[in-house]
Amino acid sequence: PPIHDFTITSTDGTDVTADVLQMENVFLLVAYDINKSDKSVQGQVNDFVSLCQKAGVEFIGLTSSAPKEVESFRHEHNSGFEYYFTDGTTLKTMIRSNPGLMLLKKGKVEGMWHYNDFPTFDEVKSHYLK
């Protein structure tokens, strides 16, 4: 069924929802409130992102935090990926973890992980990216 009231926008307000949902594979790091996000996993996230980039797999962040807060967070944690913006209630409904990781294949949820259970890239590659 179609998803209603779900939008992903860029910093400049451009709606990129359709683009994201059409991607072959895309990881979404969902952090509904970036300031309350568990920061202890950022090193692991950055390593995962690096491996995604080497393998040509898309990786983006989704948050409802203000753009200035996001830029400050990205700079502080050397995040090598872009954050996009979605309603906070929608993000909490998607995954009950801050942050949480989701894998979409052409808009279909293939995997979801709480930050305590983030997989390694090799695990994901062997199970989901065939």
Please describe what each predicted stretch is.
Residues H4-T9, V16-S37:
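Short active-site neighborhood of thiol/selenol oxidoreductases, capturing the structured segment around
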Residues S37-R74:
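Structural microenvironment flanking redox-active thiols in thiol-disulfide oxidoreductases
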Residues V30-I34, T63-S65, H114-Y115:
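Structural motif
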Residues F6, P99-W113:
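A short, hydrophobic beta-strand/beta-hairpin element that forms part of a small beta-sheet core
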Residues K108-K130:
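Thiol-/selenol-based redox modules, centered on thioredoxin-like
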Residues F27-L29, G61, L103:
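Structural beta-sheet core signal
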Residues F59-L62, H75-N98:
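Short, internal strand/loop/helix patches
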